[in-house]
């Protein structure tokens, strides 16, 4: 129904009365309400899920029938059957009437009346739609509500029609209904028998007449709006019904009505196409049942779109004829947006596939637009005209697309919410569970496992108790049998039965329901006699066949043969009295043994015992202890009880009443044995003023638990409490419930008896007295084992008396008391009457002292309770253990180590260890003769993160306000009183070695902050700061300074500072820190952090400077470090200490020798004098103070001033800059002084005094950016006059703090000077009108040479001058150098210092200007500078050649021609080069050329350079005439690589006429041939496998590789391309031939026009000599001649040419290598036998006898 509660009841009753009244039946409202309540009881789902439709109503009937079978017909109201029968008949007639939607909201009275009027009558809507108008009205309403749910945007309701018109329609509708009833007659009332005999599965409906559905459907369809699909049905036309004006509908129906009034609305809602007859295909529209759509939407939402049940609903929808628009709207309305996109995509893909497959078979019958509803079939009105075959294809694709949606998995939320109700039968729950699971996943093993799991998890607690014993072994059928008669009474009864039989509840249930039949277990029935399975008691053989054996001799009296339990003797056989016979539960063998009862309490045997309220109550003093060592008093139950889980918390009576002893409170806790049997005792607190009966709160932890009377179930612990001054709500608690009483502690009352305690030492038990006055544990001599070693001590123990002859244990002893243990080193006293346990062991046992006074007891506890506070945990870089072996120690040091370790163990600073960490320890002897234990923690320190310094500097006492009272306290052994975090202790372990490995090393670890750990100071500071934080908060107007273990307290009032001291000591003690009372300093004459506070002045403690041990650099560094430490209290300037600082210059070796200079001795004497009078003042924060910058020599000095010096501020001796002007030092002091003022007083000084005039100060602000920065944010005043005090008069002696000799503009009558310097050490000073002054020093750098030139100018010229230099460094020295402080760290310190002295001696001004060099500009200044610059050059041609060769490694000819040096010098440079001689002498260029001019013939090949890696394939092209070379490094030698190389070669070298290569595949490929043909280049190849044909390029390979190796050894190259480019540059543009021409010049230069010589040459074919002819070219091994009668030249070996001369003695022609004709006999006899001329070629080359001679003549 969707409406629950009172509104739902009211609505149902109204509908029920209205329906029955239309049939002439009247039902009372009380009867209707009774029926509705019974309906909810039988069908609890009806109010939320059901509706008044035939299907739901039949379901109600089935459940009513089941209810009658289970509870009887008498349990059903008398009016239930008749009402149900009447409503069933009404619903059968009206079929799908849906009154209340599952989505309905709460309704008002008006909505109720309106809904009833429109839904229960034959409304005007029926007249609009025909006789089936009610069904259409339901569709309208349900569509509206469902659309609201889907789209979350309900349609706007139209305004309701006029009320009078509405009443008129209602009246007409009632008349129609009345006529219908008269025609059908009255329905007779059915009795209960007819109800029970009803066929519940009869779902047939009586046929009804339909109106003209086509017209009505046309009114309810809109082409532009489809919300939900309905079905259309093809039927024969029926007579058109009478139409009347309808009531104004609401919701979606209103929107449809409005659309109908506007025009043709063919599709107001989607339809399906159902053909009942093939005779008439006229479509008639019928709405698709909304219940089906709701079911589909619910299944998708709860189970997923691909669940089996969901697919069944989809198949049901697909059984109708739906258009594409219908399917789209259905999917969009029910699927999620993501799933809808998936469905739409799949639908479109499958439609396309179907159209492609049917292209040949059904051509023209189906198209993609038809299946998708696009194009001309876009509108729904056009889609209804589709044939059934097309609609069948649409449905097939839609269902396949739906099934293709991936499954989202099991809806866990749905199954998790499906739980068994408290009153629901288990079999009903299993039925619902199986239905839900099978809807989500198919039947199978997986679904069965899920059902069994949920059958246990989602069952109610009662069924879970019944199922639990058989959960793993039983089946679903076993679960159902176990829960068949489930009820709390059954569970409790079974628990009682299990308890009576002595069985566990689970065992009993397993035997009863564990899979057997008839309520028996799997092993059969259980015998109540022996407890075994498989038989019952009457068949038990043990009971029938066995008899009890006769008793033996009584173990009690030993006088007769009877059972001990039957013994009645009062005396034994010897006449001794016997104790009473015990008859408690432990002696009963028939009872199950449980927790043993308490000892007999008073009242156990009195009248009424625990059940009689008249029994006298017990008091606390009547309660017994279980054992002598019991901590609590036993509380026993005074009543037999059986508890189950359903009982919850129960109160067990004890008959013990308050009040508790004075000053105590009670804590009730359970016994551990109770939990084993399933009894849980809830703890409770009993106040001391509680007077009622003490009861124990218990509950059963599992199933049933039996508590016997007298059984101990809890303990009452009596504890003392601290009474705090908290507000009291009531005066006395009286007999009210439990509560709390304040802080609770364990206690043992002090009595006349001595407080003795047993403690184990090394496993041996000792009894001793707890002595709070004993510092150390003392063992009585009679208790000390004789075999335990001891040694005598020189000390004596003092107490009330004095004990002499005291011995001490030679080894530490391990003590143990309960769960606590430790190490002690006790004393042994022979005369001691008993052992004394001292505070060294009591503090580890956690002994407390308490008194009745809250104040006293809290004070005692503060002193007695050991603090559990630890230092912060250290952050570690790694958890990897560090183990460094312990090195051996000498005997003396080993003994000292053992003694120190023993002492630290006694003090609790060490503990034994098994840590995987270990670092060495050692001892050193102090000056006092005592030994000190040290641990090398450097390795451990390296594994921890540095915590940093919490206090980067020392607190200064000058910041303590002037006039305040001061107290200073010191903490004793601060590190050793702060515990390490327990997680960190293991990392500080060490080992104590043993000589000769006589025993295993003893291992210990620190429990406190170890010395030497780098974070110990930080942890100490944090811990102490945390301890005193409460005091800081309490006394916020005080001044508290804490640094490490020193604490300073200050306050204007002496009484308050004393109060602060008391609070501070208490706070420190509370954290385990101890104050040295003897070191507390008060009020005046105080020593704090090396200073002496006396009144308002502060001085440094007396310091004696020893000079007798100042020998090394390290000694002087320590001395100056100490001086810097005390300088804030000394009027000692940096200039006065400069001689001491200068001693540090020189060798940086710490042990290098140093000596005191006379100046340094004077500085030390001055410092001693100043130390005796050094005083500073404490500041008054209420008065202003100043920062004074003092004009002192070397660097300025500053001080904070307030009627005296508060603190001196100095600058470092050495500035980080080489030259720092004096005014910059002043800005540094201002910044440092302001920072120090804020650091000490949290405030800027009120005034700043500068050592300049107002004019100078303004100029500095304008010219120097450092000055505005130093005053940034300063809100005080700047003054220019120091305070008038004799202390500051020394500053007036210093002069020259502002430059005055350097002019900022050129001087009008100044002499012009030019200076320059070079890196070769030559400096030039050119003074106008004089000869240049040149100085050379090869050790000088360029800067030194420049400065030497300037120094020369200052030495030579005393008149005003204008100096010009092209050095920016020199001009940057001025004017700062005039007042600057020079850093001695620079190498030019001497030159700069000399220059500064010369400036200070001058009487005339000078100007220093900068001029750019090497500009070539006209003018006297540029020419003068160029002249000076030229004088610095001394580089020779030979040096230039050497530098060039070092860079390029060119040949000797290139060096000779380029730098004009001799042949021998050039060859010597090449010979001395470390890289070039490895490759031999380079041959002369021009070897074996073949082209007669550039770009005629090229040779190309590939060589491999392995050093290039992936780019090892180097493609090389060389011009055979000029030897111009080009190469590229590539990743391969394929065709594409050759093409790219050729393209780059053309851009680099031009276009050749011919290219010659070898026969490599890439060179003979078609792509290469086509490429060369396009460029009109001829291509030839040599003889295969004959490298001589490529001799030139092969030689080029060697040249390239040789040049690459030279360059690679000499320099650094980033890429192979970089290196190759440099090599090509050298080969083409640097190397030269003997004529001084480079390859580039030969390649691109003009062809030489020199006359060619005439020669005689020998024809190789005929052997005859010919000529004279012109010699074109010649070289070693070759020659080219051009016969006068030939068209092309001919190549011949050079030995076959002879110079042609007129005379015999003619000089050979140059270029013929001075060859002479052969003089052998053979040559002289040769004659021209064959006169034929050599073969001619068209390319300007020649061959002889068909042989290509170009391949001949290698290098």
From Swiss-Prot:
Gene3D superfamilies: 1.10.10.200, 1.10.1200.30, 2.70.40.10, 3.30.70.270, Acid Proteases, HIV Type 1 Reverse Transcriptase, subunit A, domain 1, Human Immunodeficiency Virus Type 1 Capsid Protein, Integrase, C-terminal domain superfamily, retroviral. Residues 1490-1647 form the Integrase catalytic domain. Residues 584-599 have a biased composition (Polar residues). Mg(2+) 3 binds at residues 1501, 1558, 1594. Residues 905-1093 form the Reverse transcriptase domain. The record marks 99-100, 195-196, 228-229, 254-255, 269-270, 496-497, 745-746, 1436-1437 as: Cleavage. Zn(2+) binds at residues 1445, 1449, 1473, 1476. The RT polymerase active site binds 2 magnesium ions. Magnesium ions are required for NC-dUTPase activity. Its EC number is 3.6.1.23, 3.4.23.-, 2.7.7.49, 2.7.7.7. Residues 1307-1437 form the RNase H type-1 domain. Mg(2+) 2 binds at residues 1316, 1346, 1366, 1429. Optimum pH is 4-6. A motif (PTAP/PSAP motif) lies at residues 305-308. Mg(2+) 1 binds at residues 970, 1045-1046. Residues 151-191, 572-631, 1699-1755 are annotated as: Disordered. The active site is at residue 771. A lipid is attached at residue 2 (N-myristoyl glycine). A zinc finger (CCHC-type) spans 525-542, 552-569. SMART domains: ZnF_C2HC. One of its GO terms (molecular function) is RNA-DNA hybrid ribonuclease activity. Residues 1653-1702 bind DNA. PROSITE patterns: ASP_PROT_RETROV (PS50175), ASP_PROTEASE (PS00141), INTEGRASE (PS50994), INTEGRASE_DBD (PS51027), RNASE_H_1 (PS50879), RT_POL (PS50878), ZF_CCHC (PS50158), ZF_INTEGRASE (PS50876). Keywords: Aspartyl protease, Capsid protein, DNA integration, DNA recombination, DNA-binding, DNA-directed DNA polymerase, Endonuclease, Hydrolase, Lipoprotein, Magnesium, Metal-binding, Multifunctional enzyme, Myristate, Nuclease, Nucleotidyltransferase, Protease, Repeat, RNA-binding, RNA-directed DNA polymerase, Transferase, Viral genome integration, Viral matrix protein, Viral nucleoprotein, Virion, Virus entry into host cell, Zinc, Zinc-finger. Nucleocapsid protein p14: Binds strongly to viral nucleic acids and promote their aggregation. Also destabilizes the nucleic acids duplexes via highly structured zinc-binding motifs. NC-dUTPase has dUTPase activity, thereby preventing incorporation of uracil into DNA. Belongs to the retroviral Pol polyprotein family. This is Gag-Pro-Pol polyprotein. The lineage of its organism: Viruses, Riboviria, Pararnavirae, Artverviricota, Revtraviricetes.
């Amino acid at each position: 129904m969707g409406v629950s509660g009172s509104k739902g009841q009211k609505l149902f009753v109204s509908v029920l009365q209205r329906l029955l009244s239309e049939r002439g039946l009247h039902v009372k409202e009380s009867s209707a309400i009774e029926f509705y309540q019974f309906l909810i009881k039988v069908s609890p789902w009806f109010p939320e899920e059901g509706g008044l439709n035939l299907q739901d109503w039949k379901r109600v009937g089935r459940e009513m029938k089941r209810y009658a079978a289970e509870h009887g017909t008498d349990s059903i109201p008398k009016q239930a059957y008749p009402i149900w029968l009447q409503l069933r008949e009404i619903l059968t007639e009206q079929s799908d009437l849906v009154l209340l939607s599952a989505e309905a909201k709460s309704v008002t009275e008006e909505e109720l009346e309106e809904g009833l009027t429109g839904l229960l009558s034959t409304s005007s809507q029926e007249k609009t739609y025909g006789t089936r108008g009610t069904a259409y009205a339901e569709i309208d309403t349900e569509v509206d509500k469902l659309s609201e749910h889907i789209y979350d945007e309900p349609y706007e309701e139209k305004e309701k029609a006029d009320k009078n018109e509405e009443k008129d329609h209602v009246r007409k509708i009632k008349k129609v209904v009345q006529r219908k009833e008269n025609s059908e007659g009255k329905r007779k009332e059915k009795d209960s028998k007819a109800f029970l005999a009803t066929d519940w599965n009869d779902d047939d409906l009586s046929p009804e007449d339909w109106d003209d559905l086509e017209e009505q459907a046309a009114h309810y369809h809109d082409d532009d709006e489809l919300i939900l699909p309905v079905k259309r049905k093809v039927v024969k036309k029926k007579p058109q019904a009478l139409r009347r004006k309808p009531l104004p509908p609401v919701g979606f129906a209103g929107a449809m009505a409005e659309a109908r009034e506007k025009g043709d609305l063919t599709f107001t809602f989607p339809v399906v196409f159902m053909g009942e007859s093939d005779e008439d295909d006229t479509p008639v529209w019928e709405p698709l049942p909304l219940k089906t759509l709701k079911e589909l939407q619910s299944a998708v939402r709860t189970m997923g779109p691909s669940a089996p049940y969901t697919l069944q609903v989809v198949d049901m929808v697909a059984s109708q004829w739906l258009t594409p628009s219908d399917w789209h709207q259905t999917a969009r309305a029910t699927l999620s947006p993501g799933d809808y996109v998936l469905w739409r995509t799949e639908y479109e893909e499958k439609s396309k596939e179907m159209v492609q497959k049917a292209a040949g078979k059904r051509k023209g019958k189906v198209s993609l637009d038809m299946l998708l509803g696009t194009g001309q079939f876009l509108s729904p009105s056009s889609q209804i005209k589709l044939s059934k075959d097309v609609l069948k294809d649409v449905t097939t694709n839609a269902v396949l697309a739906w099934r293709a949606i991936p499954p989202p998995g099991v809806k866990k939320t749905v199954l998790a919410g499906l739980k068994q109700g408290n009153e629901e039968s288990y079999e009903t729950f299993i039925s619902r569970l199986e239905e839900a699971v099978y809807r989500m996943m198919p039947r199978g093993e997986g679904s069965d496992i899920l059902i069994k799991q949920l059958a246990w998890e989602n069952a109610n607690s009662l069924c879970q108790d019944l199922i639990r014993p058989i959960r793993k072994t039983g089946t679903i059928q076993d679960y159902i049998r176990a829960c068949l008669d489930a009820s709390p009474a059954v569970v409790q009864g079974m628990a009682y039965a299990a308890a009576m039989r002595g069985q566990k509840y689970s065992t009993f249930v397993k035997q009863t329901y564990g899979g057997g039949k008839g309520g028996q277990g799997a092993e059969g029935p259980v015998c109540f006699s022996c407890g075994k399975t498989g038989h019952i008691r009457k068949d038990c053989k043990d009971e029938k066949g066995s008899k009890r054996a006769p008793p033996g001799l009584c173990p009690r009296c030993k006088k007769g043969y009877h059972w001990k339990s039957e013994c009645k003797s009062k005396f034994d056989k010897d006449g001794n009295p016997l104790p009473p016979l015990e008859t408690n539960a432990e002696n009963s063998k028939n009872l199950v043994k449980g927790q043993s009862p308490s000892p007999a309490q008073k009242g156990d045997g009195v009248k009424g015992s625990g059940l009689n309220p008249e029994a006298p109550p017990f008091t606390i003093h009547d309660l017994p202890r279980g054992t002598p060592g019991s901590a609590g008093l036993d509380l026993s139950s005074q009543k037999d009880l059986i508890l189950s889980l359903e009982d919850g918390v129960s109160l067990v009576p004890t008959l013990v009443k308050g009040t508790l002893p004075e000053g105590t409170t009670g804590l009730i806790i359970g016994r551990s044995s109770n939990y084993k049997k399933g009894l849980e005792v809830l703890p409770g607190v009993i106040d001391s003023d509680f007077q009622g009966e003490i009861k124990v709160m218990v509950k059963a932890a599992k199933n049933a638990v039996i508590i016997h009377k007298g059984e101990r179930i809890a303990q009452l612990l009596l504890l003392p409490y601290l009474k705090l001054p908290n507000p009291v709500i009531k005066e006395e608690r009286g007999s009210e419930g439990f509560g709390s009483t304040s802080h609770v502690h364990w206690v043992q009352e002090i009595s006349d008896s001595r407080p003795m305690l047993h403690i184990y030492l090394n496993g041996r038990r000792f009894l001793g007295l707890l002595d709070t006055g004993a510092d150390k544990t003392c063992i009585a001599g009679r208790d000390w084992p004789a075999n335990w070693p001891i040694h005598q001590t020189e000390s004596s123990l003092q107490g009330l008396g004095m004990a002499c002859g005291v011995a001490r244990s030679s080894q530490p002893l391990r003590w143990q008391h309960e769960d606590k243990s430790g190490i002690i080193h006790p004393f042994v006293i022979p005369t001691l009457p008993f052992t004394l346990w001292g505070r060294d062991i009591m503090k580890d046992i956690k002994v407390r002292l308490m008194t009745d006074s809250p104040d006293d007891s809290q004070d005692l506890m503060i002193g007695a309770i050991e603090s559990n506070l630890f230092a912060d945990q250290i952050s570690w870089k790694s958890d990897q253990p560090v183990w460094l072996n312990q090195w051996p120690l000498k005997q003396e040091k080993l003994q000292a180590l053992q003694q120190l370790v023993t002492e630290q163990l006694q003090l609790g600073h060490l503990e034994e260890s098994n840590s995987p960490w270990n670092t060495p320890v050692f001892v050193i002897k102090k000056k006092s003769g005592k030994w000190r234990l040290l641990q090398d923690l450097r390795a451990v320190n390296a594994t921890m993160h540095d915590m940093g310094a919490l206090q980067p500097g020392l607190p200064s006492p000058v910041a303590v306000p002037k006039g305040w009272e001061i107290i200073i306290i010191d903490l004793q052994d601060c590190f050793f009183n702060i515990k390490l975090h327990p997680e960190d202790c293991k990392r500080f372990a060490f080992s104590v070695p043993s000589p000769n490995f006589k025993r295993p090393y003893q291992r210990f670890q620190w429990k406190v902050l170890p010395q030497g750990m780098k974070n110990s100071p930080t942890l100490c500071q944090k811990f102490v700061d945390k301890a005193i934080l409460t005091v800081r908060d309490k006394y916020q107007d005080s001044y508290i300074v804490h640094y490490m273990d020193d604490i300073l307290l200050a306050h204007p009032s002496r009484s308050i500072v004393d109060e602060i001291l008391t609070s501070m000591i208490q706070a420190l003690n509370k954290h385990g820190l101890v104050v040295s009372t003897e070191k507390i300093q008060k009020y005046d004459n105080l020593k704090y952090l090396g200073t002496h506070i006396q009144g308002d002045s502060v001085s440094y403690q007396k310091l004696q400077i020893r000079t007798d041990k100042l020998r090394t650099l390290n000694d002087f560094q320590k001395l100056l470090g100490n001086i810097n430490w005390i300088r804030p209290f000394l009027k000692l300037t940096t200039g006065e200490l400069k001689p001491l600082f200068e001693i540090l210059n020189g060798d940086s070796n710490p042990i290098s020798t140093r000596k005191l200079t006379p100046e340094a001795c004077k500085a030390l004497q001055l410092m001693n004098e100043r130390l005796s009078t050094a005083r500073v003042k404490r500041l008054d924060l209420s008065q202003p103070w100043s920062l004074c910058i003092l004009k002192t020599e070397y660097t300025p000095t500053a001080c904070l001033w307030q009627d005296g010096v508060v603190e001196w501020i100095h600058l470092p001796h050495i500035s980080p800059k080489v030259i720092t002007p004096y005014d910059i030092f002043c800005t540094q002091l201002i910044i440092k002084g302001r920072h120090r003022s804020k650091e000490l007083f949290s405030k800027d000084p009120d005034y700043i005094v500068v050592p300049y005039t107002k004019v100078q100060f303004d100029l500095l602000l304008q010219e120097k950016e450092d000055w505005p920065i130093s005053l940034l944010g300063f809100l005080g005043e700047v003054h220019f006059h120091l305070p008038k005090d004799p202390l500051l008069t020394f500053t007036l002696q210093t002069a020259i703090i502002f430059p005055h000799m350097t002019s900022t503009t050129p001087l009008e009558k100044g002499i012009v000077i030019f200076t320059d310097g070079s890196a070769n050490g030559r400096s030039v000073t050119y003074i106008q009108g004089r000869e240049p002054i040149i100085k050379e020093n090869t050790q000088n750098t360029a800067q030194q040479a420049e400065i030497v030139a300037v120094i020369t100018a200052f030495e030579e010229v005393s008149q005003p001058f204008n100096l010009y230099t092209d050095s920016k460094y020199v001009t940057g020295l001025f004017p700062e150098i005039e007042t600057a402080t020079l850093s001695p760290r620079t190498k030019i310190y001497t030159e700069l210092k000399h220059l500064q002295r010369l400036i200070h001696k001058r009487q005339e001004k000078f100007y220093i200007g900068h001029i750019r060099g090497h500009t070539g500009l006209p003018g006297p200044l540029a020419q003068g500078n160029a002249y000076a610059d030229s004088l610095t050059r001394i580089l020779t041609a030979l040096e230039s050649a050497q530098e060039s060769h070092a860079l390029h490694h060119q040949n000797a000819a290139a060096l000779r021609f380029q730098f004009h040096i001799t042949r021998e010098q050039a060859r010597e440079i090449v010979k001395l080069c470390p890289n070039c001689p490895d490759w031999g002498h380079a041959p002369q260029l021009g070897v074996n050329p073949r082209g007669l001019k550039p770009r005629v013939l090229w040779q190309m090949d590939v060589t491999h350079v392995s050093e290039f890696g992936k780019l090892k394939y180097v493609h090389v092209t060389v011009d055979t005439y000029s030897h111009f070379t080009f190469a590229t490094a590539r990743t391969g030698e394929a065709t594409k690589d050759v093409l790219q190389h050729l393209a780059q070669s053309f851009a680099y070298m031009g276009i050749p006429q011919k290219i010659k290569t070898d026969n490599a595949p890439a060179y003979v490929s078609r792509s290469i041939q086509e490429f060369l043909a396009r460029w009109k280049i001829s291509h030839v190849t040599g003889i295969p496998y004959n490298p001589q044909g490529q001799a030139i390029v092969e030689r080029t390979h060697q040249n390239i590789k040789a040049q690459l190796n030279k360059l690679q050894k000499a320099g650094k190259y980033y890429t192979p391309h970089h290196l190759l480019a440099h090599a090509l540059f050298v080969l083409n543009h640097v190397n030269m031939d003997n004529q001084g021409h480079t390859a580039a010049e030969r390649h691109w230069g003009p062809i030489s026009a020199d006359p060619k010589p005439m020669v005689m040459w020998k024809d190789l074919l005929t052997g005859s000599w010919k000529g004279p002819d012109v010699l074109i070219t010649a070289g070693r091994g070759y020659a080219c001649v051009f016969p006068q009668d030939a068209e092309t030249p001919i190549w011949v070996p050079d030995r076959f040419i002879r110079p042609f001369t007129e005379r015999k003695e003619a000089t050979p022609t140059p270029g013929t290598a001075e060859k002479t004709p052969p003089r052998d006999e053979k040559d002289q006899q040769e004659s021209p036998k064959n006169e034929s001329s050599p073969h001619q070629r068209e390319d300007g080359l020649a061959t002889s006898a068909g042989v290509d001679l170009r391949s001949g003549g290698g290098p």
